[in-house]
């Protein structure tokens, strides 16, 4: 299993919109993908504009297949629209 962690920095006052987009757009889209395991949007209690998006797939090939879909090209920009920037790091779950 692989897990992708994306540290997102929401634009000022965009946190609620980012959370809504995750719940209503991104999570339903990614959860329907073959090989999908789990996703969560985490917000540290001490930082209002910082988030961690965690996405897990059975394999890296499954994740890359999702990234290559038209649906991903529709929903990911909706997440990015609420962000000032982000950094991603991939992990193998052991």
Over which residues does each language-model region extend?
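Noncatalytic linker/hinge segments flanking ATPase motor cores
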Residues: 20, 44-50, 78-85, 93-94
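Short, flexible segments with low predicted structural confidence
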Residues: 1-3, 18, 34-36
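Short, surface-exposed ligand-recognition loops at beta-strand->loop->(often short) alpha-helix junctions
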Residues: 9-22
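Short, well-ordered beta-strand segments in beta-rich or mixed alpha/beta enzyme
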Residues: 2-9, 40-67, 92
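An amphipathic, aromatic/His-enriched active-site/gating alpha helix that lines ligand/cofactor pockets
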Residues: 24-37, 56-90
């Amino acid at each position: 299993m692989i897990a992708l962690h994306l540290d997102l920095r929401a634009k000022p006052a965009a946190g609620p919109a980012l959370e809504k987009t995750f719940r209503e757009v991104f999570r339903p889209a990614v959860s329907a993908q073959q090989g999908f395991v789990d996703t969560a949007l985490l917000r540290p209690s001490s930082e209002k504009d910082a988030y961690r998006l965690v996405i897990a797939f059975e394999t890296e090939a499954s994740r890359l297949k999702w990234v290559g879909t038209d649906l991903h090209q529709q929903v990911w920009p909706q997440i990015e629209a609420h962000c000032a920037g982000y950094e991603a790091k991939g992990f193998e779950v052991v």
